[in-house]
């Protein structure tokens, strides 16, 4: 049995008995995570729980254009407003297993252990992505703290060990990496079309972009100094030093 599935079953057994010795949580810290970014545009996402935590999860999904269904007998005012304006679909009732049908992922954000377990077990039967807030063994994906600036996104994860530590790291990383890096990412993206059309191999394109990013002068420092025109000039100079191969 996979480590994740075993840890989840063990955690369910402990929770149903009203105990949790945290051994299953400790086991999860040794489980390697496959880091990925999901495109949620138009995908059906389920959030169970209408409190402040549910609000946080709903807003995260909406920010990525997910199609969100909320299931909860009641909800905080902000979630009620999202439902009124049509940003989310709100099923004002208790969770039912059928709520998982057709969903891409599910997030359980309730204070009721039985409900959270039901969401987890139903998602497991359907081989769905599932996150039960603050119960890492009942998650087959976790939600890292995210630093977002323009196209730049940096994820910070402690594998569920300490969300508070991840949030502190988020603040510190945002202070170090942020707007200058995001603006450089935009400038480099503008050159991607030229690179794909002109440079025939992945190695050529890798060398082109790494030469700019790691070059002298440092493009990030130029942006910090307000010299974005100089960054564009660097990119143009790099293009000239990487001419298209002659036709055979």
Model-found features: residue ranges?
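Glycine-rich, highly charged phosphate/nucleotide-binding loops
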Residues: 81-101
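An accessory alpha-helical subdomain
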Residues: 160-248
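ADP-ribose/adenylate-binding Rossmann-like module
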Residues: 105-111, 116-143
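E1/E1-like adenylate-forming module used to activate ubiquitin-like modifiers
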Residues: 132-182
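Residue-level detector of alpha-helix initiation sites
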Residues: 52-53, 113-114, 160
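Hydrophobic, well-ordered beta-alpha structural blocks that scaffold small-molecule cofactor pockets
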Residues: 11-13, 17-82
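Structural motif
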Residues: 44, 104-105
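Short loop/edge segments at beta-strand edges and connector loops
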Residues: 72, 90-94, 134
């Amino acid at each position: 049995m996979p480590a994740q599935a075993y840890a989840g079953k063990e955690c369910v057994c402990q929770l149903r008995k009203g105990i949790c010795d945290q051994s299953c949580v400790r086991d999860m810290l040794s489980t390697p995570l496959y880091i990925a970014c999901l495109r949620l545009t138009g995908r059906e996402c389920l959030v169970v729980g209408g409190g402040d935590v549910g609000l946080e999860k709903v807003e995260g999904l909406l920010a990525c254009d997910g199609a969100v269904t909320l299931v909860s007998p009641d909800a905080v005012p902000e979630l009620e407003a999202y439902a009124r304006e049509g940003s989310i679909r709100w099923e004002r009732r208790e969770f039912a297993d059928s709520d998982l049908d057709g969903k891409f992922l599910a997030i359980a954000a309730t204070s009721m252990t039985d409900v959270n377990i039901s969401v987890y077990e139903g998602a497991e039967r359907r081989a769905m992505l599932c996150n039960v807030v603050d119960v890492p063994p009942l998650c087959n994906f976790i939600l890292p703290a995210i630093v977002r600036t323009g196209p730049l996104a940096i994820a910070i994860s402690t594998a569920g060990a300490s969300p508070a530590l991840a949030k502190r790291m988020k603040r510190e990383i945002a202070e170090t990496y942020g707007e200058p890096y995001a603006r450089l990412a935009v400038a480099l993206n503008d050159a991607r079309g030229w690179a794909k059309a002109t440079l025939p191999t992945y190695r050529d394109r890798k060398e082109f972009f790494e030469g700019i990013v790691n070059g002298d002068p440092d493009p990030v420092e130029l942006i910090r100094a307000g010299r974005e025109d100089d960054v564009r000039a660097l990119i143009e100079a790099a293009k000239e030093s990487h001419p298209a191969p002659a036709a055979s």
